[in-house]
């Protein structure tokens, strides 16, 4: 990529995601009690303060302390460093792909900050009704970092699929 602004500007999103994630978590910890529920949109969306000692859906919460540190701190840290390195080395990424990757990085580093500095676990607080889909009445509680990881991950996946379709059409014509 020739334009340095297009190359480095997406890291601003990484910083914004980290700030939004940490500020929302600080507010939840300061103004809510653990397990407190505050309805936001009826029963559809609640604020529910919980600490998550596992990964997504609390996976790994029952692991021993050393296993949790390796699987939930060390490995994610290495993956985020590898993703950052791939971003910095690749000239093939599109502008959109760079923004999506930086959103994922922001969410990943936001949750890692909790794992490093909150012994209780990652602060989760967004609780959404799931209407019994997949046998779940409510989706597992999550946070702003998780939202950015999922939304940017989906955006990146869709972008890569569309790019592949476009390249195939160009190759076939």
From Swiss-Prot:
Keyword list, A-Z = Aspartyl protease, Cell inner membrane, Cell membrane, Hydrolase, Membrane, Protease, Transmembrane, Transmembrane helix
Q: Which gene encodes it?
A: lspA
Q: Which residues cross the membrane?
A: 9-29, 37-57, 70-90, 142-162
Q: Which processes are annotated in GO (biological process)?
A: proteolysis
- Give the main EC class: hydrolase
Q: In which pathway does it act?
A: Protein modification; lipoprotein biosynthesis (signal peptide cleavage)
User: What domain of life is recorded for the organism?
Assistant: Bacteria
Which InterPro entries does this one have? Peptidase_A8
What membrane topology does the UniProt entry give?
Multi-pass membrane protein
| EC assignment | 3.4.23.36
Catalytic reactions of this protein = Release of signal peptides from bacterial membrane prolipoproteins. Hydrolyzes -Xaa-Yaa-Zaa-|-(S,diacylglyceryl)Cys-, in which Xaa is hydrophobic (preferably Leu), and Yaa (Ala or Ser) and Zaa (Gly or Ala) have small, neutral side chains
Q: Which family does it belong to?
A: Belongs to the peptidase A8 family.
Q: Where found?
A: Cell inner membrane
Q: What's this chain's function?
A: This protein specifically catalyzes the removal of signal peptides from prolipoproteins.
Q: Name one GO molecular function term.
A: aspartic-type endopeptidase activity
A cellular component annotation (GO) from this entry: plasma membrane
State the active site: 124, 146
Instruction: From the Swiss-Prot or TrEMBL record, give the protein name.
Output: Lipoprotein signal peptidase
KW Cell membrane (keyword) present: yes
């Amino acid at each position: 990529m020739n334009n340095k602004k297009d190359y480095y500007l997406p890291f601003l999103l990484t910083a914004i995601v980290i700030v939004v994630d940490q500020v929302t978590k600080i507010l939840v910890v300061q103004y809510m009690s653990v397990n407190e529920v505050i309805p936001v949109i009826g029963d559809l969306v609640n604020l529910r303060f919980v600490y998550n000692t596992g990964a997504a859906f609390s996976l790994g919460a029952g692991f021993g302390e050393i296993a949790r540190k390796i699987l939930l701190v060390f490995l994610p840290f290495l993956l985020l460093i590898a993703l950052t390195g791939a971003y910095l080395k690749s000239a093939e990424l599109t502008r959109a792909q760079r923004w999506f990757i930086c959103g994922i990085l922001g969410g990943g580093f936001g949750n890692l900050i909790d794992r490093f500095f909150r012994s209780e676990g990652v602060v989760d607080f967004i609780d959404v009704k799931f209407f019994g889909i997949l046998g779940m009445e409510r989706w597992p509680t999550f946070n702003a970092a998780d939202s950015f990881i999922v939304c940017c991950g989906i955006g990146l996946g869709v972008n890569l699929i569309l790019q592949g379709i476009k390249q195939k059409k160009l190759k076939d014509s």
